[in-house]
Structure formats: C-alpha cells, structure tokens
Amino acid sequence: MNTKIIKKVIDALKVYGFQDVSFCDKTKQFLFHNETDIMSGYAEITYSSQFEKFNVQIHPIETHHQAELQEVERHIQACIRKVEYLNALLTGQTKLDDKIIIIM
C-alpha cells in the first residue's frame, strides 16, 4: 500500500471523527478509535490487515424499543457507507458509482 493511499485513508478517518489515527508499517494495520461515538457499542468500524479491508462489526442488540432499533439501524447504515468509501480509497478508486452522503 503506498503512502498516498494511506494518507487519504487517514484523512478520511479523521473526517469521520476518529482520534489517534495512524498506520503501523510493521503490522500493516490502521490504528484508530472514536471515544465520542456513543453508538459504537452497537456497531463499529474495524480494519483487517489480513484481508486489507475495513469492516462493520455489529454487536448483539437487546431491546424492545422501536425508536432505539431505528437509531441503531441508521448507525449501521452510516457505518456501511463509511466502510464502502474507505475500501474504495484502499483500492485507489477516486469515486464510487453511487453518490454517498455521510451524516454524522
């Protein structure tokens, strides 16, 4: 992975609100976290150095409140859109086929 792509991914992660964003050359791993995301207990973005892809990790949800489920669904969809964009950056794509609007 070249440094230009790494920089673009790091910049995108910072725009998404992640803190302490970096890339470890030794492990080929993107390092980042988001302490301000209260919804990260339901779904979070992770990076797999084995597959060289970003993923959405969804945690078990236990609730009977419709409004809470809808909020979790919106958060998961936002995570999916972010992951699609980050993975497009990794492959060198400058544009996705569909326009994506990320609402934080």
Question: Model-predicted segments: where are they?
Answer:
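Negatively charged, low-complexity tracts enriched in Asp/Glu with abundant Ser/Thr
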Residues: 1-32, 69, 86, 93-104
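Intrinsically disordered, low-complexity regulatory segments enriched in Ser/Thr/Pro
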Residues: 37-78
